[in-house]
Amino acid sequence: MALRCWDTARSLGSRIFGRYAFTVRALSSLPDKKKEFLHNGPDLQDFVSGDLADKSTWDEYKGNLKRQKGERLRLPPWLKTKIPMGKNYNKLKNTLRNLSLHTVCEEARCPNIGECWGGGEYATATATIMLMGDTCTRGCRFCSVKTARNPPPLDANEPDNTAKAIAEWGLDYVVLTSVDRDDVADGGAEHIAKTVSCLKERNPKILVECLTPDFRGDLRAVEKVALSGLDVYAHNVETVPELQRKVRDPRANFDQSLRVLRHAKEVQPDVVSKTSIMLGLGETDEQVYATLKALRAADVDCLTLGQYMQPTKRHLKVEEYVTPEKFKYWEKVGNELGFLYTASGPLVRSSYKAGEFFLKNLVARRKTKASKV
């Protein structure tokens, strides 16, 4: 998802210059500051930082947002991201390599990797650790993680190594996710639960979010993870029911995912449940609204909505680039439907750090309330 520096400059350069190729008559009616900007042209920072997107309003964007037959959509300006860099970014990357750990941030090419790993406004670095290796037994058409029928065996040292890494970073909120491991008897539930236990042993105050597979619908595996001591149980439905077969591996489906989320709350009512939906795959507004209602009916607490971005040419094409204004609309709808938290934006992902600050406070409040009862 994240673009390399040169690819970014090369692919976006023609769009940026082309967008500002005005006639002399059009230029004469512009404010002085904008004339000066057009005269000087964009610099390198405009290509890599997203600053250019702030110089015009989104409703002025003239490019196509919906894909026509046979075409590939161009990236709109609001989806440009900063190139990852900084001390925190390098520190996290080095620790991961030394302990042979993987992150979904890298494997899924997340566009927020620089912001989350580098810290940002809150100066707190966040990485989503991907357990059970870097190879998945599923083949979802939106995902860039490697796939194989028989991935390498689980690393017995991974739970302890993960706890060591988190302790070294000094984080107080961590997200654990994993590949699907249909080749393992319990889908890896015991492995995930053990990792949570190791984290809590080293730091009882740490808050742990687990973004889990569907475990082939095995509710005993769901229960094992839900009762492991985690604070947030997340499982992504990914898209609306009507697009499940097109987007996800045939072994996954909406109803199965809904049962996973519902069962986690049934066996551990104090856990915060969370899911995520990608937009831009061809869904309709009516389908999105019905999906949100179904999630609330299953007692899902938190929701994230983000733009689907095609990771490689082999994956599903983007059908539509949803505007930031439309994402704001879905955030409002989610809050009106009763979700405790709705994060909705083009670059929002299920593990996006903005939600974690809210969830941290939400979990803390629930624990305080429970202790007073």
Curated annotation (Swiss-Prot):
Gene Ontology MF terms in the entry: 4 iron, 4 sulfur cluster binding; lipoate synthase activity; metal ion binding
Keywords per UniProt: 4Fe-4S, Iron, Iron-sulfur, Metal-binding, Mitochondrion, S-adenosyl-L-methionine, Transferase, Transit peptide
Cofactor: [4Fe-4S] cluster
Domain Radical SAM core: start-end pairs: 121-340
This protein's record includes keyword Translocase: no
Organelle targeting peptide span: 1-26
PROSITE patterns from the UniProt entry: RADICAL_SAM
InterPro entries named among the record's database cross-references: Aldolase_TIM, Elp3/MiaA/NifB-like_rSAM, LIAS_N, Lipoyl_synth, rSAM
GO cellular component, one term: mitochondrion
Residues involved in [4Fe-4S] cluster 1 binding: 105, 110, 116, 351
Details of cofactor binding: Binds 2 [4Fe-4S] clusters per subunit. One cluster is coordinated with 3 cysteines and an exchangeable S-adenosyl-L-methionine.
Annotated metabolic or biological route of this protein: Protein modification; protein lipoylation via endogenous pathway; protein N(6)-(lipoyl)lysine from octanoyl-[acyl-carrier-protein]: step 2/2
Family affiliation: Belongs to the radical SAM superfamily. Lipoyl synthase family.
HAMAP family attached to this UniProt entry: Lipoyl_synth
Name of protein: Lipoyl synthase, mitochondrial
Species for this entry: Mus musculus (Mouse)
Gene: Lias
